[in-house]
Amino acid sequence: MRSVITGVAGVGKTTVLDIVARESGIPVVNYGTLMFEVAKRRGLVENRDQIRKLSRETQVDLQKLAGEEIGKMENAIVDTHMSIKTPFGYLPGLPEWVLRSINASVFVIIEADPAIIKRRRDNDPTRARDDEGVDSIREHQEMNRYFAAAYSIFSGATVKIVKNEEGKPEQAADEIVRVIK
């Protein structure tokens, strides 16, 4: 079974996914990292930031190749983005060609209270993130739901929304494990 697990920056996805991987024994594959590894093997880039500078056509090819690699995995948790917020609007994190190759059984969205997410972002000096307000974070979480519904219509996969309550990542992880096992 291949599961796609997403969440906005600061929702606690990495913490929850570490627990899910440990409890389920299913490997976590970061989609962006896999794209980078494919690009590096092909001699296209030396670091992950260079991917953004490749032509759109090359990036689409990398998306397809990474998706095909994931599609060959019997069990995998795919760590990626449901939608990507840009200055020009929201982009799909899983365009049609990626959805088709990954062939996920379930899309999981990890959510948290937008005020808590904002506080986590503000208190994380290790990341350079855009300064988004609570309303903007709320909107992005809502958009992730809309994108997940659209992906579900196309793929037939189920959609599960999991709350990551402050200080309780184990509860969120347990709920996810029940869905993906």
Swiss-Prot record:
Location relative to the cell: Cytoplasm
Matching InterPro entries: Adenylate_kinase_AdkA, P-loop_NTPase
EC numbers on record: 2.7.4.3
GO MF term set: adenylate kinase activity; ATP binding
Primary localization: cytoplasm
The protein's name in its UniProt record: Adenylate kinase
Reactions accelerated catalytically: AMP + ATP = 2 ADP
The entry's keywords: ATP-binding, Cytoplasm, Kinase, Nucleotide-binding, Transferase
SUPFAM superfamilies: P-loop containing nucleoside triphosphate hydrolases
Any single Pfam family the record assigns to this protein: AAA_17
Keyword match Cytoplasm: yes
UniProt key word Cell membrane: no
Chain residues that bind ATP: 7-15
Stated family: Belongs to the archaeal adenylate kinase family.
Highest taxon of source: Archaea
Species annotation: Thermoplasma volcanium (strain ATCC 51530 / DSM 4299 / JCM 9571 / NBRC 15438 / GSS1)
Source species taxonomy: Archaea, Methanobacteriati, Thermoplasmatota, Thermoplasmata, Thermoplasmatales
UniProt GO cellular component terms: cytoplasm
